From Swiss-Prot:
An endopeptidase which hydrolyzes the gamma-D-Glu-(L)meso-diaminopimelic acid bond of L-Ala-gamma-D-Glu-(L)meso-diaminopimelic acid and L-Ala-gamma-D-Glu-(L)meso-diaminopimelic acid(L)-D-Ala peptides. It is active on spore cortex peptidoglycan. This is Gamma-D-glutamyl-L-diamino acid endopeptidase 1. The keyword NADP does not apply. GO terms for biological process: cell wall organization; proteolysis; sporulation resulting in formation of a cellular spore. It comes from Lysinibacillus sphaericus. Substrate binds at D255.
Length: 396
């Protein structure tokens, strides 16, 4: 929600008026010096939208404010042209409304366009969110990263490395939405206040690493006839892509990282297909390159890669993980009921590479149980299991 500065206004005043933490206001207006506000300057208030209200007989701004449980000044700020003593029946005014509901509806076939639309809605409503593409997919779809937090400890979560594990994307987007709601409404999640976590951590989210693959599983093959025929051939001449894990080039993105890639490659398929083909060499696919570049450019304390399924958490690689990894995975297990497993007896995964090159904690979390793609009817159950892990990843 946008408002215009009046004489005497300050971000401190707006924080008190709208009951929004000052840090969120500062982070929503990063290009503005709070000590040098100018009359007429536009300020963004996070966690609010405006709704239209039509004046009826006997209305006054004071009565409307009382009925909506708002300070009168909040209504005046979003209606700078209105003269309160000259309201007339049928006139339309704007009324601030605090966001207390989710903007993300994850309980549907959640493809790339839905995610991008939800990211746009969240960034509009919560302008302290930062986001930029980290690269493009094979089909030139920008792969977004979202940053939330103001702390020095950098943490990373990612989802939908594998196409038919796309339910991980709406799960992680729903957590982001709930985190935002708790911050702006100053409420708790499972008894935890989110404000301190926001100030201690910066969370990097890549909610869909493999957009082309997700769209293939959900929407079927693209219109391009040559590509469609190639994909069907790679898919064992089937037009049912529900078992497809790879990117649109038929390369498994979680077999693309230089962590004993040669060992994984030796036992995996040698040609493109729906799963397990690791490519001709490590880091040949744009989505894997984008993730590697992002990881090298940040200073992540730890990383969590969300997959499905199995209700397990893999936490080691070749005994290169630091001692704190075991302490952390025990907490993840406590809050989720998931089983910790030190080694998956596999190589070339993102988590493997992170542990190998940084000697820091990395985890692969296998959400839910069943056959991929997990049914959307399992969404609430999976989300409640995952929520404890999302939170623990911030407070540990």
């Amino acid at each position: 929600m946008d408002i215009l500065i009046r004489p005497g206004d300050s971000l401190w005043y707006f924080s008190d008026l709208f009951k929004i933490p000052l840090q969120l206001l500062l982070d929503s207006n990063r290009n503005i010096n709070p000590q040098l506000l100018q009359v007429g300057q536009r300020i963004q208030i996070p966690g609010y939208v405006t709704t239209s209200y039509t004046i009826t007989q006997g209305d006054s701004l004071w009565q409307i404010a009382q009925n909506k449980n708002l300070p009168l000044n909040a209504i005046l700020l979003v209606n700078p042209e209105i003269q309160p003593s000259r309201l007339h029946i049928g006139q339309t005014i704007q009324v601030p409304q605090r966001l207390t509901w989710r903007l993300v509806n994850g309980q549907q076939n959640y493809d790339y366009s839905m995610m991008m639309n939800d990211i746009k809605k969240l960034q509009t409503a919560y302008p302290f969110l930062q986001g930029t593409p980290i690269g493009n997919s094979v089909l030139a779809q920008p792969i977004p990263e979202i940053l939330i937090g103001n702390g020095s400890k950098r943490i990373h979560y990612k989802a939908s490395f594998h196409a038919n594990e796309w339910i991980t994307t709406p799960i992680i987007m729903t957590f982001l939405n709930d985190y935002l709601l708790a911050l702006t409404n100053q409420t708790t999640i499972r008894g935890l206040s989110m404000g301190p976590l926001y100030n201690q951590t910066t969370l990097s989210l890549v909610p869909m690493v493999n957009p082309d693959g997700v769209n293939l599983v959900i929407n079927g093959p693209p219109a391009n006839e040559a590509l469609k025929n190639k994909l069907i051939a790679w898919n064992h001449n089937s037009q049912n892509f529900s078992g497809w894990k790879a990117n649109i080039n038929g390369v498994d993105l979680n077999d693309q990282f230089p962590a004993k890639w040669e060992l994984e490659n030796a036992r995996n398929p040698q040609t493109p297909g729906p799963r397990d083909y690791g490519g001709e060499a490590p880091l040949t696919q744009p989505e894997a390159i984008a993730m590697a570049d992002l990881t090298r450019s940040r200073n992540f304390a730890w990383v969590l890669a969300f997959h499905t399924q199995g209700r397990v958490i893999y936490w080691g690689f070749e005994n290169l993980e630091p001692p704190e990894s075991q302490t952390m995975v025990e907490e993840f297990s406590r809050v989720s009921g998931y089983e910790p497993i030190q080694s998956a007896n596999s190589y070339a995964g993102y988590k493997d590479w992170f542990i190998q090159d940084w000697r820091r904690p990395g985890f692969t979390v296998e959400l839910g149980s069943g056959t991929n793609p997990l049914p959307i009817s399992e969404f609430d159950t999976i989300y409640q299991e995952a929520l404890g892990i999302f939170l623990a990843g911030l407070y540990l």
